[in-house]
Regions:
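Acidic Gly/Asp/Thr-rich repetitive segments characteristic of extracellular carbohydrate-active
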Residues: 35, 44-91
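Boundary at the C-terminal end of the N-terminal hydrophobic targeting segment
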Residues: 26-28, 32
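Extracellular beta-strand-rich solenoid/capping regions of secreted or surface-exposed proteins
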Residues: 79-87, 99-115, 122-141, 147-164
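Acidic glycine-/aspartate-rich tracts in secreted/extracellular proteins
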Residues: 71-72, 96-98, 118-121
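Bacterial N-terminal signal peptides
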Residues: 13-23
């Protein structure tokens, strides 16, 4: 008699579990918010990112643009083309060397990651004219900026104005001729 009662309880439990299982949405957290791990609350930009910009998402989850030429222009495959696009995007480099800008480069569309570490060999250098970031949510990594004095004036090699969530990581900025 006791075995029948235990069996009946087990069957009832299984039926109840099978009935309730579809009601719980997939991916639903069973932990209250205050018990969730720090990882689920705060996703950092990249391993080792620190400081106020560490949660910048850049182009995460967006389109990937490949820089396939060192030329400066608005044709597909150039850095300028990739930076002029809108929406979340990551720029990777299939070439290494120096991109000699024909004019200043203004980054005005945010949600952007420029992954200089993706370049082969010695990486990428941006030269001749300044680069200015005027957009939110931008990550720039592993690039060299060498503006020099070819373009005239006293430019900064890399600058930013009126932007939030900006990370400049492992970049070298030199040969600027401003405010000496």
């Amino acid at each position: 008699m006791k075995n029948r009662m235990n069996g009946a309880y087990i069957i009832r439990f299984l039926c109840l579990a099978l009935f309730l299982l579809p009601i719980i949405p997939a991916g639903a957290s069973v932990l209250p918010d205050d018990e969730q791990t720090e990882t689920t609350k705060e996703l950092i930009a990249f391993p080792g990112a620190e400081g106020f910009g560490r949660n910048t998402t850049g182009g995460r989850g967006g389109k990937v643009y490949h820089v396939t030429t060192l030329e400066d222009g608005l044709q597909e495959g150039t850095l300028r083309y990739a930076l002029s696009q809108e929406g979340a995007r990551t720029v990777v480099f299939d070439v290494a060397g120096t991109i000699f800008l024909d004019k200043r480069l203004d980054i005005t569309n945010g949600d952007l990651t420029i992954a200089g570490q993706s370049a082969p060999g010695q990486g990428v250098c941006i030269a001749r004219y300044p680069v200015t970031i005027n957009a939110d949510n931008v990550i720039v990594r592993y690039l060299r900026f060498r503006v020099g004095n070819e373009g005239g004036g006293e430019p900064d090699g890399l600058g930013s104005t009126d932007c939030r969530n900006l990370i400049i990581d492992h970049c070298s900025i030199s040969w600027s001729v401003d405010e000496c």
